[in-house]
A protein has these predicted regions:
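Conserved HGGG/HGGXW glycine-rich cap/lid loop of the alpha/beta-hydrolase fold
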Residues: 1-43
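The conserved beta1-alpha1 loop
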Residues: 7-9, 63, 180-181, 213
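Gly/Ala-rich beta-loop-alpha elbow adjacent to hydrolase catalytic centers
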Residues: 61-70
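Flexible "cap/lid" loop of the alpha/beta hydrolase fold
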Residues: 79-111, 150-155
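Conserved alpha/beta-hydrolase catalytic His-Asp/Glu region
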Residues: 114-161
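Short beta-strand/loop motif that positions the catalytic acidic residue
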Residues: 172, 177-180, 184
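Conserved alpha/beta-hydrolase "acid-adjacent" motif
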Residues: 185-191
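Catalytic histidine-centered segment of alpha/beta-hydrolase-like enzymes
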Residues: 186, 212-227
Length: 234
């Protein structure tokens, strides 16, 4: 049995994955989306389906902060973890740290002052650059702005830049696929590299690195199924 559980990042929802899941479903993958609930009071956390299959694949797709939102139990039991523009510590150690922190504090202020909509629109727009927002998410995003869960947006934004130790719960022999966009305007390159370096040093099996040209923090206009299928068969 081939299973996928996804976790979107901050300011997004499960519809972020809709364009990608089509090819997986066509190829007999069982797909479940976690929903954090930024645009409503509804949230959902999927669980692995028990299977006796000897060729079991349990793959998590984590985008950005989604790695920290995904329950540890799900990650522990995964055979494959796909990290898409993910991080352990969002803030870099270099002198860019204070500049990025000030930007995050301005975003917090917008939420506190009850002005989150324009801020979130700008964040999502920059997240998809140099591409456009994917159509499935775009339709839902603009409709859902009226029902924003501002309390959750704010508390998760504060969590996003907390300093963290290395995630020791990861299995040493876990197969990790580390996807890194080359035009990411949200996640600093240093933060991404630091996470990859830590994984390389700590795990028995080095992560498989995939660099994507012409992609931003949020992926669009690519066939994620083919990219991952090639790595699974490698």
């Amino acid at each position: 049995m081939k299973q996928i559980i996804t976790q979107h990042g901050w300011g997004l929802n499960k519809y972020f994955w809709d364009d990608y899941k089509v090819d997986f479903l066509k190829n007999n993958w069982h797909w479940q989306d976690n929903e954090r609930g930024y645009f409503s009071t509804n949230n959902y956390q999927a669980k692995w389906i028990k299977s006796e299959s000897k060729k079991e694949i349990r793959m998590t797709l984590c985008h950005s902060f989604g790695f920290h939102l995904m329950p540890k139990k799900i990650l522990k039991e995964a055979t494959h973890i796909v990290l898409i523009n993910s991080f352990n510590n969002f803030l870099p150690l270099s002198n860019k740290r204070n500049f990025i922190l000030r930007s995050l504090k301005r975003m917090e202020t917008k939420i506190i002052k009850d002005e989150p909509k324009d801020m979130l629109k700008e964040f999502i727009y920059r997240s998809f650059m140099p591409n456009h927002m994917n159509n499935s998410f775009k339709k839902i995003f603009y409709k859902s702005l009226e029902s924003l869960n501002k309390t959750l947006l704010l508390s998760d934004l504060k969590e996003l830049y907390m300093n963290r130790d290395f995630p020791v719960f990861l299995k040493k022999d876990c197969k990790i696929i580390f996807i890194k966009s080359e035009n990411d305007l949200i996640l600093d390159n240093e933060s991404s590299n630091n996470f990859l370096d830590s994984l390389n040093k700590t795990l028995d099996r080095e992560p498989t690195l995939i660099k994507l040209a012409q992609q931003g923090h949020c992926l669009n206009n690519l066939n994620l199924y083919e990219i991952l299928r090639n790595k699974l068969n490698a």
